[in-house]
């Protein structure tokens, strides 16, 4: 059987991304990803933490600032991302390695926690990666954007512009994890914070900023939060922009047929 690695065009795309991407924008997005990681991991302590698809290292930097773990490790598909991580001089980071997207250079159950945040939607062979995470990690945190909507097949150009070749809902991600032999410990959903929407709207898209436009962003966020709290989990997941789950290897693997 031919060995599977990430395609060369995918590696090139991410090399270009980390060379050219806006540091302020990535730091802002990472701020909330870290909040989700910390929240879903409450009650647990970790010695060795590995981030798979660590990008430019901003998430590990913010976790290190919060003393989230004793030591950190990073693997990243792109050479430019690896260099950016090294430039951050993150305290307690023990290894920074480029990898092929599917094979982790670590032993079985050698990591207390693996973090995979906003990576799975970009992965060509998602189940292969999940099996490798399950081999190496005692626990795993996964976060994905909630991309799926009715008519998603008519918006392929939109999602591919962000590199999203897979789309998820909370239920579809849970199904994927359960059928790959994971046990879900804790999960959460969240909406895009107003400051993130404002940055993207006014800085990235360069739309005019005024009282009405900023008020609409704040109002939409508040309505979603209130509606979700009143009408429960089903509506909360429908309105969500992010889904975060803490999981581990299940004691019993699912049977097929």
Identify the residue ranges that each predicted region occupies.
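Conserved N-terminal segment of class I S-adenosyl-L-methionine
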Residues: 1-107, 113, 130, 163, ...
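Feature marks short, surface-exposed loop/turn motifs that line or immediately flank catalytic pockets
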Residues: 81, 147-150, 191-193
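A short beta-strand submotif of the Rossmann-like class I SAM-dependent methyltransferase core
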Residues: 113-119
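Di-metal (Zn2+ and/or Mg2+/Mn2+) metal-binding site signature of metallo-dependent hydrolases
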Residues: 122
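A short glycine-rich, Lys/Arg-flanked "PGG" loop and its adjoining helix->strand segment in the class I
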Residues: 127-142
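Short, glycine-/aromatic-enriched active-site segment of Class I SAM-dependent methyltransferases
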Residues: 143-166
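Short alpha-helix
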Residues: 165-181, 186-187
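Conserved catalytic loop of SAM-dependent methyltransferase domains
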Residues: 186-220, 241
